[in-house]
From Swiss-Prot:
Role of this protein: One of several proteins that assist in the late maturation steps of the functional core of the 30S ribosomal subunit. Associates with free 30S ribosomal subunits (but not with 30S subunits that are part of 70S ribosomes or polysomes). Required for efficient processing of 16S rRNA. May interact with the 5'-terminal helix region of 16S rRNA.
Family annotation (HAMAP family): RbfA
Protein's name in the database: Ribosome-binding factor A
Keyword annotations: Cytoplasm, Ribosome biogenesis
Source organism phylogeny: Bacteria, Pseudomonadati, Pseudomonadota, Betaproteobacteria, Burkholderiales
CC terms in the record's Gene Ontology section: cytosol
Keyword Cytoplasm: yes
Subcellular location as annotated: Cytoplasm
Family matches, as PANTHER family: RIBOSOME-BINDING FACTOR A, CHLOROPLASTIC-RELATED
């Protein structure tokens, strides 16, 4: 079985499928104007497939508000996943705001500022 680090190819396939299905379900099934535009960045499954950490970014809403809404709807989304996926165990969903995008933007700004200062000094 092919592995990426310690993650099996089956784990990766199921993670990808969960991410795809959840993205569609959040867009179509959750009608809360406070949610904003949610993008699922990744899904990390535990080896026993019992839990899934779902990392998301949000545009047009506060991340804390979006996380609270997604946490509130996790049971509903779990039941929809159970109907769509053909696997024995559908994991419990745990939503986490992914700050890596904001961190990358901040680092890019700092690099640009450093380069601008450096070119002025030359």
């Amino acid at each position: 079985m092919a592995k990426k680090g310690n993650i099996s190819s089956r784990n990766l396939r199921i993670s990808d499928q969960i991410q795809k299905e959840l993205a569609e379900m959040i867009q179509r099934e959750i009608r809360d104007p406070r949610l904003g535009l949610v993008t699922l960045q990744s899904v990390a499954l535990t080896p026993d497939y019992a839990h899934a950490k779902v990392y998301f970014t949000v545009l047009g809403a506060e991340p804390e508000v979006a996380a609270a809404i997604l946490k509130e709807k996790a049971g509903y989304l779990h039941s929809l996943l159970f109907k769509r996926l053909h696997i024995h165990t559908v994991p419990t969903l745990h939503f986490h705001h992914d700050t890596s995008v904001e961190h990358a933007i901040e680092m890019s700004k700092l690099i640009n500022e450093a380069n601008a200062t450096r070119s002025k000094d030359d």
